[in-house]
Swiss-Prot record:
ATP binds at residues 261-263, 348-351. Homodimer. The tRNA molecule binds across the dimer. It holds the Pfam family tRNA-synt_2b. The gene is serS. It comes from Streptococcus thermophilus (strain ATCC BAA-491 / LMD-9). Keywords: Aminoacyl-tRNA synthetase, ATP-binding, Cytoplasm, Ligase, Nucleotide-binding, Protein biosynthesis. CDD domains: SerRS_core (cd00770). Belongs to the class-II aminoacyl-tRNA synthetase family. Type-1 seryl-tRNA synthetase subfamily. It is an enzyme of class 6 (ligase). This is Serine--tRNA ligase.
């Protein structure tokens, strides 16, 4: 959530920045007008309350002197009625202001490229060379069926589209991948967590999913519970409403969790395979940082995600998202895209973002600065480390062999009882 004072004090510059994120001028002009009116009413309210206090003192004095205080009482009643009217008007303005503020996206960092959509994202670097196959490559969904490790048909029967069963070495491969990821992040100082898989609406508001993106989630009817779309939500809200000791920062969390997404706007996209599911596993990284350190922490987080891909020997590239393609809460985002041979392209496997104080303001997560003793908003960061299903897809396609088998990456073999290859059924 943005700071109204910051918008007020730097309106023109921030309006330009928010325009690059699709915020129309009329919205910000309405916010400005409401803010001006609100401050005018607050001044008037304070003046009237001062008059009421004086009138109250005059009434008390008159009563002590056994004088008629009817005029003072009438005057005070009139002032009190005016105050009540102003308070009602202020409440209505506050509601309108809040409705606008909670739907405004974060302000992009100056280093973020300006652009309308993914076509204007900027490539930062690449790692690894895509393998040159001397046979026709199969898509991971075909490989999974041929190997007997992914069952789409029964997933659809039991639940519906975009669901599947992992089976045998497929289930073991997925488990090996996320255990490997968690172990690697633990080496980098992340505290491993097991979170609730349901959160309340306040938590969804805190990280920016609510109220704007309700349609993308699964809610439990008749309750305050929502199935988590990512472990970012419970991990970030772990400190909601708390004041941390500045000496403890930065704090690193990592967690494996299922992610539940309705994919409301994805009809017709990635209808086959592991790229876009209603339920999938993801290892998440979350950081709590002092503001002055948060961009260094973002770069470190990207390196942590890259480390997984490099140890799996999967070719990838790092992209800086432009203003028009960033997520709602992000001030800056890097995407890591892994090479998918059957599609002859790179696909997102991790997204690492610095939200600056956007989520911290919504969730009221603060710290006491040991230098001056003041309580301040901290910065929160989040990133995938990595999306597990997409990692399975990348391994199946990049490690496939001409005979239909799939070689298991070396770093995963200790997690799979020493198995080196998955053979066709």
């Amino acid at each position: 959530m943005l700071d109204v004072k910051r918008i007020r004090n730097d309106f023109d510059a921030l309006s330009e920045k928010l325009a690059t994120r699709g915020v129309v001028a009329e919205t910000l002009n309405e916010l400005k007008e409401l803010d001006v009116k609100r401050r005018e009413l607050l001044i008037k309210s304070e003046e009237l309350k001062a008059q009421r206090n004086i009138a109250s003192d005059d009434i008390a004095q008159a009563k002590r002197n056994k004088e008629d205080a009817s005029e003072q009482i009438a005057a005070m009643q009139k002032v009190s009625a005016e105050i009540k009217e102003i308070d009602a008007e202020l409440a209505a303005i506050d509601e309108k202001l809040n409705t606008i503020i909670v739907t405004l996206p974060n302000i992009p960092n100056d280093s973020v490229p300006v652009g309308a959509d993914e076509d204007e994202n900027v490539e930062v670097r690449r790692w690894g060379t895509p393998r040159d196959f001397d046979f026709e490559v199969k898509a991971h969904w075909d490989l999974g069926e041929d190997l007997g490790i992914l069952d789409w048909e029964r997933g659809a029967k039991v639940t519906g589209s975009r669901f599947l069963f992992y089976k045998g070495l497929g289930a073991r491969l997925e488990r090996a991948i996320y255990n490997f990821m968690l172990d690697e992040h633990a080496k980098e100082g992340y505290t491993e967590m097991i979170t609730p898989y349901m959160v309340n609406h306040d938590s969804m508001f805190g990280t920016g999913q609510y109220p704007k993106f309700k349609e993308d989630t699964f809610e439990l009817d008749g309750t305050d519970y929502v199935l988590i779309p990512t472990a970012e939500v419970p991990l970030t809200n772990y400190y909601r409403g708390e004041i941390l000791d500045g000496k403890e920062l930065p704090i690193y969390f990592t967690a494996l969790s299922p992610s539940f997404r309705s994919e409301a706007g994805s009809a017709g996209r990635d209808t086959r395979g592991l790229i876009r599911l209603h339920q999938f596993h993801k290892v998440e990284m979350v950081k709590f940082s002092k503001p002055e350190d948060s961009y260094d922490e973002l770069e470190k987080m990207v390196v942590n995600a890259e480390n997984i891909l490099q140890k799996l020997n999967l070719p990838y590239r790092v992209i800086t998202l432009c203003t028009g393609d960033m997520g709602f809460s992000a001030a800056k985002t890097y995407d890591l895209e892994v090479w998918i041979p059957a599609q002859n392209t790179y696909r997102e496997i991790s997204s690492c973002s610095n939200t600056e104080d956007f989520q911290a303001r919504r969730a009221q997560i603060r710290y006491r600065d040991e230098a001056d003793g003041k309580v301040k908003l901290l910065h929160t960061l989040n990133g995938s480390g990595l999306a597990v299903g997409r990692t399975v897809a990348a391994i199946l396609e990049n490690y496939q062999n001409e005979d239909g088998s799939v070689t298991i990456p070396e770093v995963l073999r200790p997690y799979m009882g020493g198995a080196e290859v998955i053979l066709p059924k």
